């Protein structure tokens, strides 16, 4: 393999500056069962993966059970294809008395082409609850 004609694996996996150095909350590979007849991955599958990532982040912060109460914003920038490795990056946007809002960005590493592309972004809100499913306060100084 010539260095002039072939890209190295490290070159192909170079992350864009927006995600370089960040660790995804979850990373999954889109499979055929996740797609529609046209071969694109269902938007609902992407939404559910984003929800899992956001809930994991909220739970780690609150150290308590959380439930999804809303999606305030959701944008689909590009399709996800079968075989893409999708990374979900989370960032805490707001913390209220009982709620946590998490910004979630999804990036696909393309199986074909070997490049990263931002595919979705959204704001998900979670509420902390007790065993009886009642909202509970998030302790300060988390």
Predicted regions and their residues:
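Short, ordered coil/turn segments that flank beta-strands lining enzyme active or ligand-binding pockets
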Residues: 33, 37, 131-132
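HotDog/MaoC-like acyl-thioester-processing domains
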Residues: 3-7, 13-16, 20-26, 81-82, ...
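Short, well-ordered turn and helix-capping elements at secondary-structure junctions
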Residues: 32-34, 71-78, 108-110
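Phosphate-binding glycine-rich loops and adjacent basic patches that engage nucleotide phosphates
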Residues: 6-20, 46-52, 65-67
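Hydrophobic beta-strand-centered segment that forms part of the acyl-chain substrate-binding groove
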Residues: 41, 52-89, 93-95, 99-101, ...
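A conserved, well-ordered hydrophobic junction motif at loop->secondary-structure transitions
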Residues: 35-48
């Amino acid at each position: 393999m010539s260095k002039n004609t072939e890209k190295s694996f490290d070159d192909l996996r170079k992350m864009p500056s927006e995600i370089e150095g960040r660790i995804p909350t979850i990373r999954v590979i889109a499979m055929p069962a996740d797609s529609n007849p046209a071969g694109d991955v269902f938007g609902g599958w992407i939404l559910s993966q984003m929800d899992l990532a956001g809930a994991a982040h909220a739970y780690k912060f609150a150290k308590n059970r959380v439930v999804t109460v809303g999606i305030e914003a959701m944008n689909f920038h590009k399709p996800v294809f079968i075989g893409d490795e999708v990374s979900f990056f989370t960032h805490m946007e707001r913390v209220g008395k009982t709620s946590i809002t998490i910004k979630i960005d999804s990036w696909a590493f393309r199986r074909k082409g070997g490049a990263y592309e931002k595919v979705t972004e959204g704001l998900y809100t979670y509420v902390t609850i007790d065993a009886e499913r009642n909202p509970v306060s998030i302790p300060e100084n988390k």
